[in-house]
UniProtKB/Swiss-Prot annotation:
It comes from Heteropneustes fossilis (Stinging catfish). InterPro entries: Ribosomal_Su5_D2-typ_SF, Ribosomal_uS9, Ribosomal_uS9_CS, Ribsml_uS5_D2-typ_fold_subgr. Component of the small ribosomal subunit. The ribosome is a large ribonucleoprotein complex responsible for the synthesis of proteins in the cell. One of its GO terms (molecular function) is structural constituent of ribosome. PROSITE patterns: RIBOSOMAL_S9 (PS00360). This is Small ribosomal subunit protein uS9.
Amino acid sequence: MPAKGPLQSVQVFGRKKTATAVAHCKRGNGLIKVNGRPLETIEPATLQYKLLEPVLLLGKERFAGVDIRVRVKGGGHVAQVYAIRQAISKALVAYYQKYVDEASKKEIKDILIQYDRTLLVADPRRCESKKFGGPGARARYQKSYR
């Protein structure tokens, strides 16, 4: 058990489409849970690897001193996974900036951005709204001349 001191924690969110994941990162011993369940229980396995990307990129030793708990809601399965991985990455960067040192935070940030920018920067694309005169955002109803 770590020494009892002031509570060191950061709260960060990750977003993708309508999915929002809120990550609480505090001093601990390497626990990462999503909605109260460990990452290993996420199905299917391909999406599980997407979630593990930040851990695999940075190595387990960087996550060893922190516990990350993520709550996620909204969106579909894939959007939720992308929101979670963004929240985990941003939480670690924020924790290192606030409680560790700037150099290691910059190192982590550079590794993540070099691999995939969406790990730290939200994707601004949203669904375009439907307009009148057609069944969707851009498609028009069929026109008949006779």
